[in-house]
Amino acid sequence: WEKGYPVSPTDIRDTMDYIGSFSLYAYEDELRQGFLTVEGGHRIGIAGKTVIEGEKVKGISHISCINVRVAHEKKGCADRVMPYLWEDGRFLHTLIVSAPGCGKTTMLRDIIRQISDGESPYPGLTVGVVDERSEIAGCYLGVAQNDVGIRTDVLDCCPKAEGMMML
C-alpha cells in the first residue's frame, strides 16, 4: 500500500457507481466540476477526458483517477482572530488571504459558525453562504454536513454571482 494500489477500469467504474448510488446521471452538474460531494461532506475528485461544448465542460468521460478528500472541521480555529473582526458591535468586512493549503476554508467555516451561533461576547447573526463547490458547508442532498451554525442559510453548488443576488 505504500506504493499505491493499481486500479483497473472496472475498479473505477464500480467505485463511481457506488459513490453515485448507481445513479451518476443525478450528479451530472457536480461531476462536470470534477468532483462529487458524498455524505459527511467528503469530496471525491475525478479526472479523465473532458467533454467540451461551446468552450464549457459538458462532462467527464473515461474517468481514470479518483481522489478522496476527507472533510474535517477544526472548531475553534478562528478563536484568536474573532476579536479583530468586530468593531463597535458590528462585524467588519473581512478578506482572508494565504497560500494554498493553509486553512483559509477551515478558518472561514469556523468564523461563519461562530458568527451564526453567537459566541460570547458577540451576538448570533444570520449568515448567508454561497457555497459554489460544496467546500464550506459540505452539503449532501441539501443538508450541511459541516457545522456552519444555526442561523446560516446555504446555497449549495450555486454560482457566486447568482447566489449573491438570491441572498
Which sequence ranges carry the predicted segments?
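N-terminal accessory targeting/assembly segments
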Residues: 1-40
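P-loop NTP-binding catalytic core
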Residues: 24-91
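Helical mechanochemical/support elements of P-loop NTPase systems and associated helical scaffolds
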Residues: 8-15, 42, 92, 107, ...
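Short, catalytically relevant binding-site loops at active-site mouths
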Residues: 52, 75, 101-102, 133-137, ...
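P-loop NTPase switch/communication element
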Residues: 116-161, 165
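Signal for well-folded cores of large energy- and translation-related assemblies
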Residues: 17-20, 24, 51, 86, ...
